[in-house]
């Protein structure tokens, strides 16, 4: 296609154009669009989008983040030719995986070291905020990362996230009191959230759809290995040296990752946006409402699940105002004339909406299993923190291996729909089998049930992400990935909190009228003189956790049904290479 003959060629300057290709030609075309107008096809083999009555000024944010039509017809998907920068993937991918490893490691590494940290810093009851601060900051920053990576550039956001993570790690290691540590864990979480979001986006920028599942599979393995090693590394460090090295150990590894990416990561440059245009077009109301809503909602969930006082005024206020802010964000995104944080068109088809919801449900189930199975082993089977980690290895190892195999299978078969459906079927079977875990169930059998569940969990990591990336045009890739990751993290937080409600409610109900409390440890239960009463209490605690698995079954059933609505898109792209080298911070957004 000749740029001079393209529609609207006189309506926008080069700064408001987006790089696309058709066949072997590369050209800049206007991207300013209006949802109210009918679809205008520029080239049926290249791409289609909606026209706009008013074209905004040069470099307009609105022209950068146009709302592309996402077809609901099977064969009408736009065939975008991907412009790939020249990269040494054998260097860049390990650099990205190192950063992912650190962000994932710090979610679990402190679990076995918390008693040591609390004793050293005299933390008392505030210990729970060591983990909460990280997860809260990580989740709340996700909506911001996608849009800012479009405005200021992928590299700036990615490198800033890594630097923030390393700075937070150094300050956590130097913490002299619990408040210091919690605040710096929040800084770590902001960096970790940026890393998770930007690595996902950058991989989509530098790899074509047909090979991308292999690299997202690497992400799954890296995440799984870090999750497995986290408690073991944390326990080993806290027992053999100072707990501060749990955080200091991030510095050399993170520094290596940052150096590799600065010197070797190349991205295709895009038009810049002036600061005045940014202030004019950026959706400040949207970013404030979604960030405030997520923070308040997660605070309510965390405080409620930690204290068990769900009817307390503070908890209810956090939850209610959080939900209202999120609802306000949705309304704002539907009607705002500014650049949207999350484009509604990312949810406009049943297929995309199904993938987003199943991602939430997937992480809901995964979080309940990974959080409450260690409690089962420690409270019912008498495991210490280290041994409970060993007994949950089947969950982590199997899910990581299956995630890698799933990614390779999707890449080879060019199909993500069947692995997604199969994953939900296996996950439903796994959650159903876990209902058979009682207080006297042999540990090998329990590990077998966990392994079956892990097959379903691991098999769903790659199909969901690939389905999103295959279904949206390049202009919506960053914000769609951020929305996807936000829903995943929200699912995990909701899962842990709902699990806490079920667990506490069941213990309170089943122990009502007895002399036993709801906070007994294994040693306290084991010291009950009467064998019948001892077995009764063990059975009550086991049934409280078992109720969580019972609730997981209909959740998995809903996920399985929704997976059938996912549409299979083509996992192939025409690729042309962008020749110019692009180092360091050179690329524009």
UniProtKB/Swiss-Prot annotation:
Where does it reside?
Membrane
The source organism is Schizosaccharomyces pombe (strain 972 / ATCC 24843) (Fission yeast)
Q: Name one GO molecular function term.
A: transmembrane transporter activity
Which Gene3D superfamilies does the entry mention? MFS general substrate transporter like domains
PROSITE patterns reported for this sequence: MFS
Q: Which Pfam families match?
A: MFS_1
Listed transmembrane segments: 90-110, 128-148, 162-182, 189-209, 217-237, 245-265, 284-304, 311-331, 355-375, 390-410, 418-438, 448-468, 483-503, 545-565
Keywords annotated in UniProt: Membrane, Transmembrane, Transmembrane helix, Transport
Give me any GO biological process, just one: basic amino acid transmembrane transport
Tell me the InterPro entries matching this sequence: MFS, MFS_dom, MFS_trans_sf
Q: Tell me what topology the record assigns in the membrane.
A: Multi-pass membrane protein
A GO CC annotation recorded here is:
plasma membrane
Could you identify this protein by its name?
Answer: Uncharacterized MFS-type transporter C1399.02
Q: Which family does it belong to?
A: Belongs to the major facilitator superfamily. TCR/Tet family.
């Amino acid at each position: 296609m000749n740029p001079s003959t393209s529609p609207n060629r006189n309506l926008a300057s080069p700064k408001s154009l987006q790089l696309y290709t058709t066949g072997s030609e590369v050209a800049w075309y206007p991207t300013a669009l209006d949802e109210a107008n009918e679809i205008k096809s520029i080239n049926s083999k290249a791409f289609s989008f909606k026209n706009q009555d008013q074209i905004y000024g040069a470099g307009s944010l609105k022209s950068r983040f146009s709302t592309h039509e996402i077809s609901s017809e099977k064969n009408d998907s736009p065939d975008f030719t991907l412009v790939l920068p020249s990269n040494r993937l054998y260097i860049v991918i390990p650099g990205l995986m190192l950063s992912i490893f650190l962000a994932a490691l710090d979610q679990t590494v402190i679990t076995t070291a918390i008693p040591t940290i609390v004793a050293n810093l005299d933390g008392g009851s505030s210990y729970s905020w060591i983990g909460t601060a990280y997860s809260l900051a990580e989740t709340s920053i996700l909506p911001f990362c996608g849009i800012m990576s479009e405005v200021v550039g992928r590299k700036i956001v990615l490198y800033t996230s890594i630097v923030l993570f390393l700075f937070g790690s150094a300050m956590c290691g130097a913490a002299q009191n619990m408040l210091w540590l919690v605040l710096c864990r929040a800084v770590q979480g902001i960096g970790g959230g940026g890393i998770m979001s930007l690595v996902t986006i950058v991989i989509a920028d530098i790899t074509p759809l047909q090979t991308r599942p292999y690299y997202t599979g690497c992400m799954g393995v890296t995440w799984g290995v870090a999750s497995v090693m986290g408690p073991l590394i944390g326990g080993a460090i806290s027992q053999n040296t100072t707990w501060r090295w749990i955080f200091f150990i991030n510095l050399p590894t993170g520094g290596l990752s940052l150096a590799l990416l600065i010197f070797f990561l190349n991205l295709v440059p895009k038009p810049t946006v002036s600061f005045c245009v940014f202030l004019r077009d950026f959706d400040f109301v949207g970013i404030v409402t979604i960030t405030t809503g997520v923070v308040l909602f997660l605070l309510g969930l965390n405080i409620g699940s930690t204290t068990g006082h769900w009817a307390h005024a503070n908890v209810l206020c956090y939850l209610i105002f959080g939900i209202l802010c999120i609802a306000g964000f949705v309304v704002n995104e539907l009607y705002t004339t500014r650049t949207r944080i999350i484009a509604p068109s990312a949810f406009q088809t049943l297929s995309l909406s199904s993938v987003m919801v199943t991602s939430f449900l997937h992480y809901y189930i995964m979080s309940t299993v990974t959080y409450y199975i260690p409690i089962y082993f420690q409270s019912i089977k008498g495991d210490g923190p280290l041994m409970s980690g060993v007994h949950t290895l089947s969950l982590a190892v199997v899910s990581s291996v299956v995630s890698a195999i799933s990614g390779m299978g999707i890449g080879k078969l060019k199909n993500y729909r069947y692995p997604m459906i199969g994953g939900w079927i296996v996950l439903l079977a796994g959650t159903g089998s876990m209902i058979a875990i009682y207080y006297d169930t042999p540990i090998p059998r329990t590990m077998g049930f966990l392994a079956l569940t892990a097959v379903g969990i691991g098999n769903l990591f790659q199909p969901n992400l690939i389905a999103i990336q295959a279904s949206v045009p390049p202009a919506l890739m960053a914000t769609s990935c951020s929305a996807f990751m936000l829903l995943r993290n929200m699912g995990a937080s909701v899962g842990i909190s709902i699990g806490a409600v079920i667990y506490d409610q069941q213990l309170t109900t089943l122990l009502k009228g007895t002399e036993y409390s709801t906070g007994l440890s294994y040693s306290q239960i084991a010291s009950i003189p009467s064998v019948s009463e001892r077995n009764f209490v063990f059975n009550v605690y086991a049934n409280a956790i078992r109720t969580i698995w019972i609730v997981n079954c209909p959740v998995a059933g809903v996920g399985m049904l929704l997976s059938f609505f996912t549409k299979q898109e083509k996992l192939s792209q025409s690729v042309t290479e962008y020749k110019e080298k692009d180092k360091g911070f050179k690329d524009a957004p």
